[in-house]
């Protein structure tokens, strides 16, 4: 009896144990990452030919303690390598694991290689050659703490390489994991199987091979036992012949069918090629099709299973499309696949919950470094009384109501950018802004007391509902997460896409960037204030401090300002402001842009202006500013400096976002100034629900 070890992906060990026992293995013992088992020579070959789940089958040769590199060398050399393979055979060493002595796997592999070569040369035998790419013998050494385990890898290449897939092609899941997904899906061979996002067809091919009793090792050309001196060619040929006979019989007797589709024509062509090379091409119908066009291929029955590994995303900007995809798939399943089963394997359990289906079973597994889950569902047959359930239905109803109200109003106003929803319902704590045919959803970061998983699921429901209610393409929705603002975090960079969208606001044309920054380049709540500045600016010299992207300057320029001066500390935003001015034909010496610390510039400037707009941060302690700034504490000092630049009869429009801001009217009076609060006049319909989003004042000489 041979003592053997079969490795597998984490989470598949028990499934592999059952498979090996069915092949005739005895004394099976599950450990993390594999199964120890025993069997005769025939069982060795049977496990190599028939295991759909094992990554490798290895023959343990021994263990040794490693306290120095010499210990490793001597421990390896103690094995009788000259009885394992002939000197004419090539070999390779795979070394994994480190300890205090062996700190580099390449160094460990070199010491093992030296020990094996010296085992031959000391017996005056020819030196065996190393072949890293296609060796006759593979030696596997795993170092864990002070113990090195040495084994002969009888597989050669990993057993996931069945021989039907182009090795250069990328695959999101290995064939061994795909086989496990099929086994756990609840699908019964003989019933239809459909994969609507099949990629190169791995799940369907593994299922078809399982259903037709086709051995996964039947198409492999190389094995790790070819140079092994104990290899029994006669028994191997018997195992191989039996597999060929069973495959022919299984294919001839199989009557059901498999269906695969994908939106990428190139991968569908690859899937057809893979299926043909696997010997089951005639059983699978592949077609180029998007999930949105998914239809039941057998509407009159029989019932089958939809099985897939849908895409997932690690970047925030990919989530809206994925949420929409899963939400759409859930609706299609309910509408067209009543009575069928559904099984999805994913690295994102939150996305699976967008299906709005209740899972009957779920399994965990690792796909490389990723923690994944497989969930199985049964789709109930629809009845005349069945009503579709909308995710976040209360939110969807409110958004629908707001859309009806604001869409018509925005057209009448001549604006393309407005707020559709602003945390109207406390449990749906987001802001939804429309920018022409784009939508930005801003999630306010939930309190730490809220379960993170529930918060994420609610956000996914919000996105699915937003896409559905507004009827937008998923790639036109931008998702952002932000803390509740204590000031304008306008300088926080999020990305590098550099994609700008031209929008209109009354008679102004402006550039916005929806993806690269926390803010978009246009503060929507200041829309009316900007229009007022345009109406007040004719024939006047206009100053815009803390100008951001200069949208207020554009309105002043279009309103007939004699000159405009735009000051901001950020070169990025000044360049953006220049683009905005140029877009509206406002160029030349009359329109100056100055990069400076606004507070320092204000103290040193000696010019005069008729109209000044200042919208400072609530608080700032930027390293590039000379002093920390607090708008509540420092607004009087600010007004003192502004008064010096204000021409007789001139006006300052002062705005800030500090909740509960209190204007020091007595202090202003001592400066010879008076203030009129115009906050309510500057709040448009879309911000009427949030009366504290900003406060705004007109300040003139007393």
From Swiss-Prot:
Pfam families per the UniProt record, alphabetical: Methyltrans_SAM (PF10672), RlmL_1st (PF22020), THUMP (PF02926), UPF0020 (PF01170)
First-listed, main subcellular location of the protein, grouped into a coarse class: cytoplasm
THUMP domain segment(s): 43-154
The top EC class, named as a word, is transferase
E.C. numbers = 2.1.1.173, 2.1.1.264
Q: Which GO terms describe its cellular component?
A: cytoplasm
The UniProt record lists the keyword Methyltransferase:
yes
This enzyme catalyses: guanosine(2445) in 23S rRNA + S-adenosyl-L-methionine = N(2)-methylguanosine(2445) in 23S rRNA + S-adenosyl-L-homocysteine + H(+); guanosine(2069) in 23S rRNA + S-adenosyl-L-methionine = N(2)-methylguanosine(2069) in 23S rRNA + S-adenosyl-L-homocysteine + H(+)
Q: Does the keyword Cytoplasm apply?
A: yes
GO MF terms listed in the record are: 23S rRNA (guanine(2445)-N(2))-methyltransferase activity; RNA binding; rRNA (guanine-N7-)-methyltransferase activity
Q: What InterPro entries does its record include?
A: 23SrRNA_methyltr_KL (IPR017244), DNA_methylase_N6_adenine_CS (IPR002052), RlmKL-like_Mtase (IPR000241), RlmKL-like_Mtase_CS (IPR053943), RlmL_1st (IPR054170), SAM-dep_methyl-trfase (IPR019614), SAM-dependent_MTases_sf (IPR029063), THUMP_dom (IPR004114)
User: Where does the record place it?
Assistant: Cytoplasm
**Keywords in UniProt for this one?**
Cytoplasm, Methyltransferase, RNA-binding, rRNA processing, S-adenosyl-L-methionine, Transferase
Entries under PANTHER family matching the protein: RIBOSOMAL RNA LARGE SUBUNIT METHYLTRANSFERASE K/L, RIBOSOMAL RNA LARGE SUBUNIT METHYLTRANSFERASE K_L
* Entry's family note: Belongs to the methyltransferase superfamily. RlmKL family.
UniProt function note: Specifically methylates the guanine in position 2445 (m2G2445) and the guanine in position 2069 (m7G2069) of 23S rRNA.
User: Which protein, by its recorded name, is this?
Assistant: Ribosomal RNA large subunit methyltransferase K/L
Gene assigned in the entry: rlmL
């Amino acid at each position: 009896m041979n003592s053997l070890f079969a490795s597998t992906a984490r989470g598949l060990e028990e499934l592999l144990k059952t498979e090996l026992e069915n092949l005739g293995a005895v004394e099976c013992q599950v450990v993390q990452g594999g199964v120890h088992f025993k069997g005769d020579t025939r069982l060795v070959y049977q496990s190599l030919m028939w295991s759909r789940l094992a990554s490798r089958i290895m023959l343990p040769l021994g263990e040794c303690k490693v306290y120095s590199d010499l210990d490793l060398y001597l421990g390896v050399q103690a094995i009788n390598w000259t009885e394992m393979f002939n000197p004419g055979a090539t070999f390779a060493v795979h070394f994994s694991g480190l300890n205090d002595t062996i700190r580099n796997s390449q160094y460990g592999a070199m010491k093992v290689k030296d020990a094996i070569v010296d085992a031959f040369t000391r017996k005056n035998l020819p030196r065996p050659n190393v072949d890293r790419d296609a060796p006759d013998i593979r030696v596997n050494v795993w170092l864990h703490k002070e113990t090195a385990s040495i084994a002969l890898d009888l597989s050669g290449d990993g057993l996931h390489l069945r021989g039907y897939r182009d090795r250069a092609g990328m695959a999101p899941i290995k064939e061994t994991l795909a086989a496990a997904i099929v086994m756990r899906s609840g699908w019964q061979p003989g019933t239809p199987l459909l994969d609507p996002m099949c990629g190169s067809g791995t799940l369907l091919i593994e299922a078809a091979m399982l259903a037709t009793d086709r051995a996964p090792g039947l198409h492999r050309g190389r094995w790790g036992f070819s140079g092994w001196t104990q290899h029994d060619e006669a028994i191997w040929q018997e195992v191989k012949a039996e597999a060929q006979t069973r495959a022919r019989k299984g294919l001839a007797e199989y009557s059901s069918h498999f269906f695969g589709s994908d939106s990428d024509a190139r991968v569908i062509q690859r899937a057809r090629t893979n299926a043909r090379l696997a010997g089951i091409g005639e059983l699978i119908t592949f077609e180029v099709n998007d999930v949105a066009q998914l239809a039941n291929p057998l509407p009159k029955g029989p019932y089958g299973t939809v099985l897939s590994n849908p895409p997932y995303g690690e970047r925030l900007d990919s989530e809206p499309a994925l949420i929409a995809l899963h939400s759409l798939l859930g609706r299609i399943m309910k509408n067209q696949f009543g009575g069928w089963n559904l099984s999805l394997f994913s690295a994102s359990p939150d996305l699976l919950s967008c299906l709005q289906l209740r899972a009957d079973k779920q399994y965990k597994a690792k796909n490389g470094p990723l923690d994944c889950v497989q969930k199985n569902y049964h789709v109930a047959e629809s009845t005349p009384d069945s009503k579709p359930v909308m995710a976040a239905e209360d939110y969807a109803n409110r958004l629908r109501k707001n859309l009806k109200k604001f869409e018509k109003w925005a057209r009448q106003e001549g604006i393309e950018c407005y707020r559709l929803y602003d945390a109207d319902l406390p449990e749906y704590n987001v802001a939804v802004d429309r920018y022409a045919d784009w939508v930005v959803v801003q999630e306010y970061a939930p309190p730490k007391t809220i379960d993170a998983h529930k918060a994420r699921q609610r956000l996914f429901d919000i996105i699915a509902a937003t896409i559905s209610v507004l009827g937008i393409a998923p790639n036109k929705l931008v998702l952002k997460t932000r803390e509740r603002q204590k000031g304008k975090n306008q300088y926080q960079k999020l990305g590098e896409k550099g994609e700008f969208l031209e929008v209109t606001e009354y008679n102004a044309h402006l550039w916005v960037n929806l993806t690269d920054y926390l803010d978009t380049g246009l503060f929507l709540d200041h829309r009316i204030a900007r229009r007022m500045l345009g109406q007040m600016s004719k024939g006047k010299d206009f100053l815009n401090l803390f100008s951001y992207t200069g949208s207020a300057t554009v309105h002043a320029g279009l309103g007939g300002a004699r000159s405009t001066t735009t000051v901001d500390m950020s070169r990025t935003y000044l360049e953006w402001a220049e683009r905005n001015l140029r877009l509206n034909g406002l160029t030349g010496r009359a329109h100056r842009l100055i990069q400076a610390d606004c507070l320092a510039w204000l103290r040193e400037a000696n010019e005069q202006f008729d109209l000044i707009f200042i919208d400072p941060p609530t608080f700032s302690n930027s390293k590039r500013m000379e002093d920390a700034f607090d708008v509540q504490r420092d607004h009087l000092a600010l007004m003192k400096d502004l008064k010096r630049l204000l021409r007789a009869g001139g006006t300052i429009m002062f705005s800030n976002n500090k909740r509960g801001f209190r204007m020091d009217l007595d202090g202003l009076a001592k400066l010879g100034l008076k203030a009129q609060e115009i906050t309510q006049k500057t709040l448009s319909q879309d911000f009427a629900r949030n009366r504290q989003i900003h406060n705004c004042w007109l300040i003139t000489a007393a």
